[in-house]
Each structure stands twice: as C-alpha cells, then as structure tokens.
C-alpha cells in the first residue's frame, strides 16, 4: 500500500485527530449495535499505548447540517468509555469546533481521549468546506482516517482536514484496503463473486469491473429477475427494472465473451405478497404465473451455488439472496452464509445488508473479512478511487 499508515507517524505526545465511523443505530438513547465502535478500538488503543492525545470525530445519522439532540454523540462517548475501560471526554458544542473546543484539545494529556460533537451538525461538513476543515485541523498535530464507511464521500472531516495536517490511514482502513485490494488485484483462483440485492442498477459498476477479474459470478436477490427477463422468460410480478433489460442482456453476453461463468437461479421461493403470513412455495424458473413474485432463491439454486462456492479459493459476497428480514424468505441468504463458512476460501463480505446477514446467521467471526463500509465497499469493488483514502499522504 502506497499510503502512509498509522505506524508511519510518530504519535508520541502529539494531538492526533481521528475520523472514526461511529454512525451506530441508537434507539431511545441506547446503542443497539456496537460493531462500528468495536472496529475502531485497535487504532484507539494503539494511540493510547503510544502516548498520543486522542481526539475523535464522527458523524451520526442525517441531522441535515444543524444541531439536533437525537443525533448527539453523547451516548457513543459513554459506550466507548465502557468498552475501552477509561474516561472519554465528550465535548458538546453545537458548532462542533470553536475556540473552547480547541482549548480543550490543548489541555489533553498523553493517553487521554476526547470525542467532539457530530460533524454533520454543521452544513459545511458535507460540502467539504475549506474553512470548517481548517477549524477541525486546529484541534490536532496529525490526522488519521479510520472511517472506511465514509471514505467514498469527500467531506470536511475526512478529506478537507487532510490538506492542513500530516495524514495517515488507521488500522481499520488499512485492513479494508489490503484485504479487498489483494482479492481484486491478485486473487487465489478460482475467484467467485456472489451478488444479490434488489437492483441491477446498484451493481452495474461492480459487475463491469469484476468481469475482468473473476472466474464465476453467482447472481441472487431480486436483481436476478432483470437478467432472467432479459432472456425472454416470464418472472410473474417479481421486481424488475424495465429500463435495465438491454444492459442486463449485454452484461451476460460480455461475460460469455470473457469466459466468465454466470449462474442465475433455477428456482425460487414465491408468494403472492411479500409478508410473513403469505403462503409460499418453491417453483422452477419456468413455472412462474402472473400473480406471484419471487422473494428468495430456491433449494436447487442453493445447491448449485454451494457447489461453486466449495470449488472457489477467493469469494466476495455483496447483497442478500432474498428478503432475509422475513423468515420464510431468508433461507437462501443464510444457507449461502453457511456455505461461505464451510468453504476453504478467502471470504470477503461487503458491508450493508450482507454484513447484517452474516452477523444474523452467527457467522461473522468465521469469514476472513466483513467490510465496515456499505457504499464504500461497493465503490471499491467498482474500481473507483475513494476520496477519503486518495487524499492521505503518500509513503
């Protein structure tokens, strides 16, 4: 990796400003999922162990550029204190950063931690405003980006601030880039991509980029119906993107030209309605009637996908196989998760829904890597440059 990493910086006695991703779900003041906080602990602990003065910043939710108490990071400071076993000073300012906040950063002693208020309380954050970036930079001597999940966005707290301070990536971002980068650039083969989710339009860039890299693509989720319909088959009232039929057809043709095997589902779990109560059954792809829709891949498809997964040496999975939030349409997604774990391959799970699914299936610790970025991991798989990483100092 050609970017500076945390270990390239001398952090002793320095104020280090770290962009973390503490965008966690909070219900009635209680954090319901601490994964993103956990993901940042390696970097924070390293800084404490090396006598740095630690200043943390993050966004939370979408307060639309103004202070809103329900989006305060105060509960996060309390939870982080518990998790790390030491006090985290929460500096609550509606302006996020002002003279008093800068003063607090100057009072910090080595090994102490402070967390500033939600960066999105300022509308300048999402505009990557130069003045706000400069204000943030006055909190510290060094800047570290450890928020992979926001690295596909160019905001003040992850891109703007890097123009004013020496910078590096933290351990979480480093791990994301190294693991996913190796999979894309130098994979052990056979290399299989499993793609799901509702829309082809969300995954076009990923498919186009992966056609030059993978040996096999397994397509599930509702996006499969657009591909199947592009071959002239009836899919009942299943979700399709009419304006993407020609594109789906051309992607299948491109795959054939490049010698990439694409597997589409051969059977589906179908029902008249997408509810827990609706009667569901498994049908073959040729047996669709106009009054039903597919909401999960069927048992034959699971078996075919599993056989391909077991042959693979590298696997990237992004997007669920069905509506896994509803129990009767969740089997495909959870069986694929189990199949990944059973394989002897390097297994990388993209962020967002796939990360939730792997966690829900109890297999989070049994795959090689679960990405912390939904949109960021998608854009990385598309081969796009991520601004939050691009701006970091070169080694």
Curated annotation (Swiss-Prot):
<dbReference type="InterPro" id="IPR015911">
    <property type="entry name" value="Phosphoglycerate_kinase_CS"/>
</dbReference>
<dbReference type="InterPro" id="IPR001576">
    <property type="entry name" value="Phosphoglycerate_kinase"/>
</dbReference>
<keyword id="KW-0324">Glycolysis</keyword>
<feature type="binding site">
    <location>
        <position position="120"/>
    </location>
    <ligand>
        <name>substrate</name>
    </ligand>
</feature>
<feature type="binding site">
    <location>
        <position position="325"/>
    </location>
    <ligand>
        <name>ATP</name>
    </ligand>
</feature>
<dbReference type="InterPro" id="IPR015824">
    <property type="entry name" value="Phosphoglycerate_kinase_N"/>
</dbReference>
<dbReference type="Pfam" id="PF00162">
    <property type="entry name" value="PGK"/>
</dbReference>
<feature type="binding site">
    <location>
        <begin position="351"/>
        <end position="354"/>
    </location>
    <ligand>
        <name>ATP</name>
    </ligand>
</feature>
<comment type="similarity">
    <text>Belongs to the phosphoglycerate kinase family.</text>
</comment>
<protein>
    <recommendedName>
        <fullName>Phosphoglycerate kinase</fullName>
        <ecNumber>2.7.2.3</ecNumber>
    </recommendedName>
</protein>
<dbReference type="GO" id="GO:0005524">
    <property type="term" value="F:ATP binding"/>
</dbReference>
<feature type="binding site">
    <location>
        <position position="153"/>
    </location>
    <ligand>
        <name>substrate</name>
    </ligand>
</feature>
<feature type="binding site">
    <location>
        <begin position="21"/>
        <end position="23"/>
    </location>
    <ligand>
        <name>substrate</name>
    </ligand>
</feature>
<feature type="binding site">
    <location>
        <position position="294"/>
    </location>
    <ligand>
        <name>ATP</name>
    </ligand>
</feature>
<keyword id="KW-0418">Kinase</keyword>
<dbReference type="GO" id="GO:0043531">
    <property type="term" value="F:ADP binding"/>
</dbReference>
<feature type="binding site">
    <location>
        <position position="36"/>
    </location>
    <ligand>
        <name>substrate</name>
    </ligand>
</feature>
<keyword id="KW-0547">Nucleotide-binding</keyword>
<dbReference type="GO" id="GO:0005829">
    <property type="term" value="C:cytosol"/>
</dbReference>
<feature type="binding site">
    <location>
        <begin position="59"/>
        <end position="62"/>
    </location>
    <ligand>
        <name>substrate</name>
    </ligand>
</feature>
<comment type="subunit">
    <text>Monomer.</text>
</comment>
<keyword id="KW-0963">Cytoplasm</keyword>
<dbReference type="GO" id="GO:0004618">
    <property type="term" value="F:phosphoglycerate kinase activity"/>
</dbReference>
<dbReference type="GO" id="GO:0006096">
    <property type="term" value="P:glycolytic process"/>
</dbReference>
<dbReference type="InterPro" id="IPR036043">
    <property type="entry name" value="Phosphoglycerate_kinase_sf"/>
</dbReference>
<keyword id="KW-0067">ATP-binding</keyword>
<feature type="binding site">
    <location>
        <position position="203"/>
    </location>
    <ligand>
        <name>ATP</name>
    </ligand>
</feature>
<keyword id="KW-0808">Transferase</keyword>
<comment type="pathway">
    <text>Carbohydrate degradation; glycolysis; pyruvate from D-glyceraldehyde 3-phosphate: step 2/5.</text>
</comment>
<dbReference type="GO" id="GO:0006094">
    <property type="term" value="P:gluconeogenesis"/>
</dbReference>
